[in-house]
Amino acid sequence: MEKLVTAVGAMSGTSLDGVDVAEITTDGQKIASFGASAYHPYSAADHNILSLVLGKWPEEQGLETARGLIHQRHLEAYQMLDAAELYGFHGQTLAHDPRGRGTHQLGDGHVLAQRLGKPVVWDFRSKDVALGGQGAPLAPFFHFACAQWAGLNTPVAFLNLGGVGNLTWLNPSCAAPEEKAALLAFDTGPANAPLNDLMHHRLGQPVDQEGRLATTGQVDPKLLSRWKMHPYFFQNVPKSLDRDAFSAELAELADMSLPDALATAVGFAAFGVAEAVERCPIAPAALYLCGGGRHNLALCDAICAQVACPVQPVEAIGLNGDMLEAQAFAYLAVRVLRGLPISAPMTTGVSQPISGGRIAGLDF
């Protein structure tokens, strides 16, 4: 076994709710232990600043304030935990168009490395996109390590319910995640993003707590039937989504009551998950939920009603579903440091397993 490294990863997702930070100790292959974690929420003002730059590319104007905000909030989040040997910094995804302009995560690892005085791994997605991959999702290699850490030995699936849903099907009996039969991963469709946007725009609230409002609404079946014909659901896997890929469809919720709009968005998210599970190479023995969306009971109930396998939170196998993404970027940071692959043909569509990312501050 290589020397163990204690790393802290951070994730600011497309839901724009805050920064998760989490510590992990690993050699880049096996997980030795999980450490402390913390959540640093964005204020309403922070949310507004970031919302205004969604969709922008690096060469566009008006990013300076948001970039400074991302650096400051991540620094504050990192400092909520004890100092680590290495930091993983994903940045804030503003735009994702892997077959066109590429992918844009706001933030500079060099700035954080200077302020932390420790190496920072960042820019995890660009190399994958440059080599023909989707650049997403990147958590699957970590999910594979988690399944082995939990002692699983049959194919299962992990579903991250963030702004967008991401499914990872995995076979933990394989020796390494880059093996062809070990993983299949792709985005399922919208998840929390439209729900949170509806709550923010209509009520000025960040989330529909436990999906309470959604449970009082009625799904619009005609709208849902039409949305199911979106070209994304007919694309080959692996594939990935931008946060706003379904913005034209979701704009049709504007004239509905809030409960009905939420219920319809929940129904659409659940359909995307069910359609994704059907594409798994072998039916998963269980679907494990992580991410903020697993707290939305309306969404979880809708998913349970549409998939054939048992659905459980990842806490059922000893994991922290709120921190899995942050833990993933701590784990991936160590893999980048060691030159190990972080994506493969069956996770992003890249031509061969590759180690992406850049490392700032190696001289510290």
Language-model region placement:
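Glycine-rich phosphate-binding loops at beta-strand->alpha-helix junctions
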Residues: 94, 284-306
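Conserved non-catalytic scaffold segment of RNase H-like nuclease domains
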Residues: 33-69
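Conserved ATP-utilizing enzyme core subdomain
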Residues: 14, 18-32, 39-42, 176-270, ...
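Short beta-strand-loop/turn "lid" adjacent to the catalytic site in phosphate-handling enzymes
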Residues: 57-109
